Amino acid sequence: MRKVKPARKLGRTAAHRKATLSNLSTQLILHKRIETTEAKAKETRRVVEKIITKARKGTVHAQRIIFKDIRDKEAIKVLFEEIVAKIGTRNGGYTRVIKLAPRYGDAAKMAVIELVDYHEMPAEGQKPVKQDRSKRVKGSKKSEVAS
């Protein structure tokens, strides 16, 4: 009798799925925040949480085990020197998935996955500066009138 396994297939073969999650994990460690589909973000969260938990041990054995998943020396260096130092006292919950609006082209559910302690909020009272889009677009009526 077939039993359901608790992981998403992401519409890929096993090798392609493993490579995709490895690449997403590497980029999350290097950039601290990535935007992807909701399903990939949730699966990446599972992988990264386990990787960071292993990295907290700080042993050479842990580095070798993690290197099987990540395969990027720069990411391993950042993980063990920077991330573990900052997240060292936290007991799990190292990542956060924030849902976004659907993607324009195919309406896929999008999300941002980020490391929790690296989330940087803009300074209070400071609003983001909006660009005047009419100056940016070629041939717009506003830019012709202003000229």
Swiss-Prot record:
One function term, GO molecular function aspect: structural constituent of ribosome
> What SUPFAM superfamilies does its record include?
Prokaryotic ribosomal protein L17
One GO cellular component this record assigns the protein to is: cytosolic large ribosomal subunit
Q: Which residues form a coiled coil?
A: none
Swiss-Prot/TrEMBL GO biological process terms: translation
Question: What segments bear the compositional bias annotation Basic and acidic residues?
Answer: 124-134
Keyword set, alphabetical order:
Ribonucleoprotein, Ribosomal protein
Region entry Disordered, spans: 124-147
Concerning Pfam families, the annotation shows: Ribosomal_L17
> Which superkingdom heads the taxonomic lineage of this protein's source?
Bacteria
Q: Where is the signal peptide?
A: none
Look up keyword Iron-sulfur and say if it applies. no
**Assembly mode:** Part of the 50S ribosomal subunit. Contacts protein L32.
* Family recorded in the similarity comment: Belongs to the bacterial ribosomal protein bL17 family.
User: Under what name is this protein listed?
Assistant: Large ribosomal subunit protein bL17
